[in-house]
A protein has these predicted regions:
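A short beta-strand motif characteristic of beta-propeller blades
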Residues: 52-58, 100-106, 147, 154-160, ...
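Short loop/turn segments immediately following beta-strands, especially the blade-tip
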Residues: 42-49, 90-97, 134-144, 192-201, ...
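Beta-rich, blade/repeat-based domains predominating
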Residues: 35, 60-71, 108-119, 153-176, ...
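Short loop/turn segments immediately following the C-termini of beta-strands
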Residues: 30-32, 80-82, 127-129, 137, ...
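Asp-box/WD-like beta-propeller blade repeats and closely related beta-sheet repeat scaffolds
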Residues: 97-169
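Bacterial Sec-dependent N-terminal signal peptides
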Residues: 1-23
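Blade-loop segments of beta-propeller domains
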Residues: 53-119
C-alpha cells in the first residue's frame, strides 16, 4: 500500500512544478530622484502574481529603459544623463537574477530613452539628441564602439515640445528587415532598411510618414499577425492605426485614448497588445493616469472597451506578463508597480491589491527564469 501511495505523491509534486510559471521581472528606474538604486530583478509567479525580490544592481545611472539580449544572457540599459548619456551592457544570469557589468559606451546623443537588441546590434533612440545610435555586440555580450549615428533634423508646430527632433523609439518590423523610428519633435515616423552586418551603414533611410501636426509620436506596436501597426501620440493623446506591408505604413484610422469631452492635460506614454492579439492597451499620464482598453476589430481597427485608473501617478510604462493574465503598471511619481488581473475574454482590468514598492520605476521587462 505504501508503494501505491508513493507514486501519486510524486506525480502531484511533478504536476505542481510543471504548473509553476515563474519569470524574471526586470525594472528600470530613474536614480536621480534619490529613491532608486539602479536595476531591480524580481521573481514573478504568473499563477498568483506573487512577487519576490531577487537582486538590485547598483551604481547604474538612470537606467530608464532596458532591453533583453538574445538568448536571455545579457541586458542593455540606457543611461539617460543628458550630455554624458550612454548605454551599458550587463551579463545576465537568469536563474539568480544577477547582472554583471560588462562595459558602457557613449551614445553621442543626449538622453537615450529607448533601446533594442538583436543578435548583432544594440540600437538606442536618443530623445534630446534627436538621433539613433548603433552598436555592435561582442562575443561576451559587451558593446562595440559606436558604429553609426543617424541624426534627424526638423521641427513641428508645438514650440514648447517640438522645436527640434526628439527620437522616442526605435523598433524592428516583424520581418526584421526594417527599423521603425518615432520622432516626437518632427511629427514623423521614419523607416530605415536594416542591414545588421552593414558596418557603419547598418541603417539606410527608406521613407517617412507624416503624422498629424502637434501629435507627438511616441511608441508603436505591431499586431500579432504583423499586418497592422498602432502608434500612440504623446502630446495630443491620439492613436494612428496603419496597415503594414514590407516596409510601408498606410494610415487607416485615427482615434484617441481620452473620453469625449476631456479637457485635461495629455501625457500619452505606452502601448501594448495582449499576447493573444485581441486587445490593445494604452497609458496616459498628465491629469489622467489611466489605461485605455481597445478591442481589435476586423481589419485591425480599434474600438474602445473601457478606461481604468492606474491607481498611481505617472504610468510611463506598463507590461503584460507572457501568459496574458496580469498587466503591471510602473508609476514614476508614486514609486510603485500596480498589478492588475486581466480578463482574457473581455480585456477588462481588475486591481489585485498587490504592489511592488520601488523608486521611480519607468521600464518593466519580463524574461524567462531559464
Amino acid at each position: 500500500m505504501k508503494k501505491l501511495l508513493f507514486f501519486p505523491v510524486i506525480m502531484l509534486a511533478l504536476q505542481s512544478c510543471a504548473q509553476k510559471k515563474d519569470y524574471n521581472l526586470i525594472v528600470g528606474t530613474y536614480t536621480n530622484t534619490g529613491k532608486s538604486e539602479g536595476i531591480y530583478v524580481y521573481d514573478f509567479d504568473t499563477n498568483t502574481a506573487a512577487v519576490k525580490a531577487k537582486t538590485v544592481t547598483k551604481n547604474v545611472e538612470n537606467p530608464s529603459y532596458l532591453a533583453l539580449g538574445d538568448g536571455n544572457k545579457a541586458i542593455y540599459a540606457v543611461n539617460e544623463t543628458s550630455e554624458t548619456s550612454a548605454v551599458s551592457a550587463f551579463g545576465f544570469d537568469a536563474a539568480s537574477g544577477k547582472l554583471t557589468f560588462l562595459n558602457k559606451q557613449a551614445t553621442n546623443g543626449a538622453d537615450p530613452c529607448y533601446v533594442i537588441a538583436d543578435k548583432k546590434n544594440v540600437i538606442t533612440a536618443n530623445y534630446s539628441g534627436g538621433s539613433i545610435s548603433v552598436f555592435g555586440i561582442e562575443k561576451s555580450g559587451a558593446l562595440s564602439a559606436i558604429k553609426q549615428l543617424v541624426k534627424h533634423t526638423g521641427k513641428s508646430i508645438d514650440k514648447a515640445r517640438q522645436g527640434s527632433a526628439h527620437v522616442h523609439m526605435a523598433q524592428f518590423t516583424p520581418d526584421h528587415k526594417y527599423l521603425v523610428v518615432d520622432d516626437l519633435g518632427t511629427d514623423k515616423v521614419y523607416l530605415y532598411t536594416y542591414n545588421p552586418d552593414g558596418g557603419n551603414k547598418v541603417l539606410t533611410v527608406k521613407d517617412s510618414v507624416a503624422i498629424t501636426p502637434g501629435a507627438g509620436p511616441r511608441h508603436l506596436v505591431f499586431s500579432k499577425d504583423s499586418k497592422y501597426a498602432y502608434l500612440i501620440h504623446e502630446i495630443d493623446g491620439g492613436i494612428t492605426v496603419f496597415s503594414y506591408s514590407d516596409g510601408n505604413l498606410t494610415e487607416i484610422q485615427k482615434t484617441k485614448i481620452t473620453e469625449d469631452g476631456f479637457k485635461g492635460e495629455n501625457g500619452a506614454a505606452d502601448i501594448h497588445l495582449s499576447p493573444d492579439g485581441k486587445f490593445l492597451y494604452a497609458s496616459n499620464r498628465g491629469s489622467e493616469n489611466k489605461i485605455t482598453i481597445f478591442a481589435i476589430e476586423k481589419g485591425g481597427l480599434l474600438s474602445v472597451r473601457g478606461y481604468v485608473p492606474t491607481l498611481g501617478k505617472g504610468p510611463r510604462n506598463f507590461a503584460i506578463d507572457p501568459t496574458g493574465k496580469y498587466l503591471l503598471v510602473a508609476h514614476q511619481y508614486t514609486n510603485d508597480v500596480v498589478i492588475f488581473e486581466r480578463n482574457l475574454e473581455t480585456g477588462a482590468l481588475t486591481d489585485t491589491g498587490k504592489r511592488i514598492s520601488v523608486g521611480a520605476p519607468v521600464c518593466l521587462v519580463f524574461a524567462p527564469v531559464k
